[in-house]
Amino acid sequence: MTDQTTRLPVRRALISVSDKTGILEFARELQQLGVEILSTGGTYKLLKDNGVNAVEVADYTGFAEMMDGRVKTLHPKIHGGILGRRGTDDAIMNEHGIKPIDLVAVNLYPFEATISKPGCDLPTAIENIDIGGPTMVRSAAKNHKDVAIVVNASDYAGIVEGLKAGGLTYAQRFDLMLKAFEHTAAYDGMIANYMGTIDQAKDTLSTEARSEFPRTFNSQFVKAQEMRYGENPHQSAAFYVEAKKGEASISTAVQLQGKELSFNNVADTDAALECVKSFVKPACVIVKHANPCGVAVVPEDEGGIRKAYDLAYATDTESAFGGIIAFNRELDGETAKAIVDRQFVEVIIAPKISQAARDVVAAKQNVRLLECGEWPAERAAGWDFKRVNGGLLVQSRDIGMITADDLKIVTKRAPTEQEIHDLVFAWKVAKFVKSNAIVYAKQRQTIGVGAGQMSRVNSARIAAIKAEHAGLQVQGAVMASDAFFPFRDGIDNAAKVGISAVIQPGGSMRDAEVIAAADEAGIAMVFTGMRHFRH
């Protein structure tokens, strides 16, 4: 067993970085500690111009950089110094004038930034594939018993602190080694993803005619939390987040109080937050088992999130018990008090949590309180994954949205202005309800949600039952369906309960029959041309 605590000093370091964040300060600290520094190209020039003594790698190896910098560190005096096993390879190193290198600070050519630039072509991308850097990183990581490898600027301070204490422990070097292999794995995966989208039969030099999906799919996720169990107690689980952080989400949220998030908490909170992001005006979404059971939107001058919570809760008070509550505005103390006084809640999430709200919720220590930050108005593109036995389904995120201008009126009666507001509202909610999904809404409040039924008409019946159970009036409400109606029975059922307008994608072979049913009942109906299945 390797001694985890014995400290090894650093006498010689090699520094060659593309991202120069913090490198001057780091090099100065090393110099003050008596560490000899080897460096290359732009890094060497930066150090020299700022008074840091360094030896250029070409002077040390006696071999000048060549091929426009493609070959500069690929030399036995570099890799021998990194890979040489202390106490085993000393004689051969001395024979060839190879000096041991105890620390390697390297980060790689900015391949991702390069290919993200408009008009980037294949030759440009290829020139930004680092060869010497990953080779040094892997060499140092392999020999982590004797060498420290640092690829993240965030580790510089900890390394300096360790050196001032007498050297780096094996535990520190092991952690740095793991980060290094994670770094090169992500880098190579990024290159493979990029190259894997090129259709060689069309044009190997063009970045325009690309497949959306690479030949192999490489993505890196970092473990954020090990959980007590998974969806069920007999399943083990962990929560992994994308290495590169994106917009505000459950993955970026900060937990301010409460018990540790469970597997189901994370899944349900994600559903609630993504739904509430759909709304511009103050909104509240309550979710249970990944389905919205109550949603409401209330303008600021009519009560804002405080009133929105009341209306969302009123949709289905039974299902709201033990649910997840999400807001798209800062959570204030009054709204927080209304929640904790009224119901048992697992998680509350909002872009910001006021101090007053924190003080209120602090009395309920088991309530998980999350602050996720603001999100942009325009949703970021990305990927959704669904694991199947032996495979992975990958699709672009469903960020499709519609406005009133996108609606196609297909019935004799056009919807009123208020009905249009309610139709768009209900449509946004239906997108986040498990298919088959039916949403009844009135005055931008859900009054009944029918979720996850194999028959669309049964989802409609459930929505009506929910509304009746909650004591909410269906007469004059609108109905949203996440997919088309295959038969007229869904419209006939809506007419019986008093639905006044319907929003659906359209596209059924029996659209004419469905439209006729709406006309017979005096129901206004609009098509979106966009489906929102959710499984």
Swiss-Prot record:
GO biological process, one term: 'de novo' IMP biosynthetic process
Annotated signal peptide: none
GO MF assignments: IMP cyclohydrolase activity; phosphoribosylaminoimidazolecarboxamide formyltransferase activity
Domain MGS-like: 6-151
Coiled-coil stretches noted in the UniProt entry, renumbered to this chain: none
Pathway connected to this protein: Purine metabolism; IMP biosynthesis via de novo pathway; 5-formamido-1-(5-phospho-D-ribosyl)imidazole-4-carboxamide from 5-amino-1-(5-phospho-D-ribosyl)imidazole-4-carboxamide (10-formyl THF route): step 1/1; Purine metabolism; IMP biosynthesis via de novo pathway; IMP from 5-formamido-1-(5-phospho-D-ribosyl)imidazole-4-carboxamide: step 1/1
GO cellular component: cytosol
Matches recorded under PANTHER family: BIFUNCTIONAL PURINE BIOSYNTHESIS PROTEIN ATIC (PTHR11692:SF0), BIFUNCTIONAL PURINE BIOSYNTHESIS PROTEIN PURH (PTHR11692)
Protein family according to the UniProt entry: Belongs to the PurH family.
EC annotation from Swiss-Prot or TrEMBL: 2.1.2.3, 3.5.4.10
Database matches in InterPro entries: AICAR_Tfase_dup_dom_sf (IPR024051), Cytidine_deaminase-like (IPR016193), MGS-like_dom (IPR011607), MGS-like_dom_sf (IPR036914), PurH-like (IPR002695)
Catalytic function, reaction form: (6R)-10-formyltetrahydrofolate + 5-amino-1-(5-phospho-beta-D-ribosyl)imidazole-4-carboxamide = 5-formamido-1-(5-phospho-D-ribosyl)imidazole-4-carboxamide + (6S)-5,6,7,8-tetrahydrofolate; IMP + H2O = 5-formamido-1-(5-phospho-D-ribosyl)imidazole-4-carboxamide
Gene (UniProt): purH
CDD domains, per the entry: IMPCH
Intrachain disulfide bonds: none
Protein name per Swiss-Prot or TrEMBL: Bifunctional purine biosynthesis protein PurH
